[in-house]
Design a protein with these regions (language model features):
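Catalytic Walker B motif of ABC-type/P-loop ATPase nucleotide-binding domains
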Residues: 151-155
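Conserved ABC ATPase "signature" region
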Residues: 96, 107-122
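The feature captures the beta-strand-to-loop junction immediately N-terminal to the Walker
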Residues: 34-36
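H-loop/switch region of ABC-family ATPase nucleotide-binding domains
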Residues: 186-187
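Conserved ABC transporter NBD signature motif
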Residues: 57-72
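Helix-to-loop junction immediately C-terminal to a conserved catalytic motif
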Residues: 49
């Protein structure tokens, strides 16, 4: 398995916010996390990303343990509550700041990913003047521009109009076909059922239901 979440529990100040969660995925699959606000979707993504450490259990990527103190073993793209962009920079310049120090993405590739999310690479419009939908599109572009092995998208449809949702579906399909594992959270049943190979329903930090596309749903 490329991704393994093994019996992960997270407690904060004595409160259990993630309870004994396990899931796994091979490459080239889309995993949906579904639940209302506060159900634990974002916290689980933070645990998978290594931004925070589990109280119990392990997250493994390609057999390597992920933790706050160990560099992420494979490339990672993240949209969790939106990345921080500079207000006075354009979309193009913001992505250059992220990409160039790593040396993994060329200017042409940045232009291409901006076009994919339907933002004009030539626009000099400052980020602080972006609509919420434009900000979300830029966040998605930042998450996928390096074509990482694992992509975490937390509520990526927030602030997107219908064309934006279609754009997101196209990107998810493309990255899946490339072999990435995508974990996408949403409270929107229809969108997740459309794009996901399997869905985990969360309630109060616990998996209460697991369904695989084309199979009968199982209770957690």
């Amino acid at each position: 398995m490329f991704l393994e979440v093994k019996n992960v529990t997270k407690s904060i100040h004595g409160d259990v916010v993630i309870k004994n969660v396990s899931l796994c995925s091979e490459r080239g699959r889309v995993i949906g996390l579904r639940g209302i606000n506060g159900s634990g979707k974002t916290m689980l993504m933070r645990l998978i990303s290594g931004l925070i450490r589990p109280t119990k259990g392990q997250v493994l990527i390609d057999g390597e343990v992920v933790s706050k103190d160990i560099p992420f073993p494979k490339s990672l793209g993240v949209l969790i509550e939106g990345p921080a962009f500079l207000d006075d920079y354009s979309a193009m310049d913001n992505l250059k700041l992220i990409a160039y120090p790593k040396g993994k993405v060329t200017e042409d590739e940045i232009k291409a990913v901006l076009s994919e999310v339907r933002l004009d690479p030539k626009s000099r419009k400052k980020y602080k003047k972006f609509s919420l939908g434009m900000k979300q599109r830029l966040g998605i572009a930042a998450a996928v521009m390096e074509h990482p092995d694992l992509i975490l998208l937390d509520e990526p449809t927030n602030a997107l109009d219908e064309s934006g949702v279609d754009m997101l579906k196209d990107i998810v399909k493309k990255e899946k076909e490339r072999g990435a594992v995508l974990i996408v959270s949403s409270h929107d049943r229809d969108i997740l059922e459309d794009i996901s190979d399997e869905i985990y329903d969360l309630d109060q930090g616990e998996i209460v239901r697991h369904s695989i596309k084309g199979e009968k749903r199982s209770e957690g």
